[in-house]
């Protein structure tokens, strides 16, 4: 793909197929130097969506849906009225606004609901989780017994950072705006490594060149 402008950027079809698969998405590179760097980075390793023998083979999933599963959610006010064994049955539900780089509790819920819900930033990274909703662990359709890597899929290519990835502790569940990573084998080093790489400047640059307002699974796969 070429332009007639002298300052235009050209891409080869083999590169576009490797960069975005069947979608043939065109990266938003501002100069030939950026395009050359993009092509070099995309040619070094297999795409994340490719199955590789003895690789980590990452896949992504949404654990619960904030709309479809809302009848199973317990508001924080109702959760605080429960005591002892009743309260122990519930796990916190993570929403997208709670997740930032290396921090799954960036914001805490204060009051309200829907668009009028009030949240505030936690004073320090790793502060106690204060969600808006809880859910009975027995009603969650996935295993919550281990740490998982996650990311916030509501983001933007013009934000200070596009990729916001963190580690979710066991016995917590993620809403649909916080997809989680699964690997072929259970090894705590894999989600830790994925979070570190996802939050790097290199991966952030690669991702922001291919998305607008939602970070979808196919962006990662390609």
Q: Where on the chain are the PLM-derived regions?
A:
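Polynucleotide-recognition surfaces of large bacterial nucleic-acid defense/processing enzymes
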Residues: 1-148
């Amino acid at each position: 793909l070429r332009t007639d402008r002298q300052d235009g950027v050209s891409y080869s079809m083999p590169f576009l197929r490797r960069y975005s698969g069947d979608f043939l998405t065109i990266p938003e590179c501002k100069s030939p130097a950026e395009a050359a760097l993009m092509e070099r980075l995309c040619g070094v390793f297999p795409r994340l969506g490719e199955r590789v023998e003895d690789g980590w083979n990452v896949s992504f999933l949404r654990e619960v849906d904030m709309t479809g599963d809302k009848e199973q959610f317990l508001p924080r006010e109702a959760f605080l009225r429960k005591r002892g064994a009743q309260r122990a049955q519930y796990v916190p539900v993570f929403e997208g606004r709670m997740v930032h780089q290396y921090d799954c509790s960036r914001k805490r819920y204060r009051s309200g609901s829907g668009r009028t819900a009030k949240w505030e930033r936690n004073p320090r990274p790793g502060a106690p989780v204060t969600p808006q909703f809880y859910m009975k662990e027995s009603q969650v359709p996935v295993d919550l017994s281990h740490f998982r890597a996650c990311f916030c899929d509501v983001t933007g290519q013009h934000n200070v950072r596009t990729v916001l990835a963190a580690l979710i502790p066991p016995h917590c569940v993620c809403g649909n705006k916080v997809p989680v990573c699964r690997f072929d084998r259970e090894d705590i080093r894999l989600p830790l490594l994925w979070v570190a790489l996802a939050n790097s400047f290199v991966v952030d640059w690669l991702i922001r060149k291919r998305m607008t307002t939602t970070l979808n699974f196919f962006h990662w796969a390609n």
